[in-house]
Amino acid sequence: MTSSDLLPGLCPTGSLRVVINLGNPVLAQGTPEAPTGVTVDSARELAERLGVELELTTVTAARHAYAALVEGHVDVGFLAIEPAREEGVRFTTPYVGIEGVFATGDTDLTVADVDREGIEIAVRSGSAYDLYLTRTIEHATILRGDEAEDVYEGGADVLAGVRQPVTVYAQQNGLTVLEPAFQAIRQAIAVPRDRPESQVAALTAVVEELKGSSFVAASLERAGQVATIPGS
């Protein structure tokens, strides 16, 4: 894939503007001033292929990354594929797969028991698992906040989140992570919805190349993170 296949319309300012969500520790680490991780590595690789400067904007939650894309403040972002987001962005094929899990202090609760009357589930507002549970939960109540852990500590029955940070929190607080995972979260590159499908196709080709060349696997390993790589 050459830069001429990607550049038209992708970088209207002459630089590649990318939003990085530091709220997902599997995909991004570090600080706003010095972010690291597979999303940052991928953004740098894309800018290098295009031969343009990279401008990174960091946020603390997926909903803020989504807003930056929809409002046209950035050209590229890294988000989980969810139907609710497709009205505002277009997605490539997924480059990484992670999982959404429940944790609870109720040792009698199972994954199948979570969706019942009287159960309150704590989520981070606007996250992939919030969107997924919003369209699938029929009986339980979803409680939203900036941090799911804070909502859980406010009295919710179940904490929902990405497996890795939820597991750490569960270990620190004597909770049980319920198996199996309730969601397979497919992470992809996203662009604003008004970008042409040809642009998405070109980015998808890059994603597939980065997966096939072990670029993504090597980046995850450097960051000390474990995730599945779809199609590999």
Please report, for each region that a protein language model flagged, where it lies by residue:
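Short loop->beta-strand "edge-of-pocket" segments that line small-molecule binding or catalytic clefts
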Residues: 15-22, 26-28, 36, 112-129, ...
